[in-house]
Amino acid sequence: MTHKLFEPFDLKTLSLKNRIVMAPMTRCRAGADYVPTIFMAEYYAQRATAGLIITEGMPVSPKARGYLWTPGIYTPQQIAGWKKVTRAVHDASGAIFAQIWHVGRVSHQSLQPDGSAPEGPTDEQPEGASCFAYDENGAPGNVSTSHPRALDLDGISRVRGAFVQAARNACKAGMDGVEIHGANGYLFDEFLNSVVNTRSDAYGGSPENRCRFLLEVVDAVTDAIGIGRVGVRISPNGRFNAMPEDPEMEATFLYLSEELNRRNIAYLHINDQATFGMPAIPEGLIPKIRAVFQGPIILCGGYDAPRAHGDINEGIADLVAFGVPYIANPDLPARLENGWPLNNADRDAFYGGGKKGYTDYPVYQP
């Protein structure tokens, strides 16, 4: 019997060969000036076995960076580097979306233009948050985030414009679409959270106001590159990057999901952080989101094949994203379908470095 997980799926403008998604994962392997390397083209092409690849997060501007060696999408050289990636993926019969990203307050002055402060919804610093930047001795490593400054209305407009240009650049580089990163304690997630976002203007207060920034960006990006080419990632109840518990979480994400449904986005990608020891998405919230969002839903977080089969067969998910298993298993769909054992990921090689732990994982030999 063929499980739905391995069946083709029509994702708006794309026909996917299966319902398996390669989740976006930061690997910190860009070259000088945050330009994608030829090793990255090899890495993604190896994993074109997925129905859809979602790239690692691409900062939309120099201000959007929070980690060393994360490939950007705001210079001609970066666009040229990503063209090599998309060409390799398409040559391998794959489909690929670019995740476009602003880290918000999760950054350090050593990564910011002219040593300026990171930017977020307010000037409150996340207690205990860190990022991969330069320490006081100029050495790369995990450092505490710098004190942010609050985005004013001009800054919000500037960031919105950066996302639009990044989406255009991604399409110029050959991407099949973009995913707007609204999860994991980064900029848009910070605006969504009622404890973090204490603004008193049109971008703070009610769920409608706290969702406004993300929805404006979705609208602007959709206008720029077209309906059906824009996905959104969220992480309800997430705690990454020192995000606090939000008493208005459910109301916020149900409102957001309903508004995204009205916009006919390509998909809604929901990340559950429980697999990393964080609180899980509350039981019952995903079905509530499913009731108000009728488009394709990607679920991500600690999946194996049986659970993926179950959630797709029950209609909870349309597609399932795999993260760490895809790092170590470029042939993941075949391994899942045939019950073959999985390679173990080299966690010491997750961030930075060269080909080791990146493009040297073998495919299974029956």
Where are the model-predicted features located?
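Flavin-dependent oxidoreductase catalytic cores
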Residues: 1-366
